[in-house]
Amino acid sequence: VHNADILTDFDLGEMIAAHAASGADATLLVARRESSRQLLFDASGRMRGWENRSSGEVRPAGLDAGGLDRKAFGGVHILGERACRALAARSRALGGAPFGVMPFYIDSCAELDIRGFEPAEAYRWFDIGTPEKLAAAEKSYMA
């Protein structure tokens, strides 16, 4: 799954191979970059929760975020069969109403093996969700 407002040139094949080798239920592109919202990972690379750095909110409630690694989500994710089944169950429970995938990951990280993936090589990454951000990305790619 690739969010439509993300432009990147990382090696997707490397991420697919890492996902297959790990046996994870889901693998998320992550990076050590500034973001008000950070995913929280343990030393093994498994997602344990989420933190809003602006408000101090941590989910799941009661999670001790100390010692966990903070990384920003990059908008690219690979889902295995268990994660797809869990997404379908969430959709059914909500009567087919739309829902955000990040709250799903946060709510499911205790049951599903959700892993972060950081590419080995340098890559470009842009949020192109506004005309201004798209213009900045275009300028970088044309340089």
In which residue ranges do the predicted regions lie?
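Catalytic-core segments of class I nucleotidyltransferases/pyrophosphorylases
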Residues: L7, G13-A20, R33-E34, R46-A143
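A short, conserved acidic/glycine-rich loop-to-beta-strand motif
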Residues: S22-R32, R37
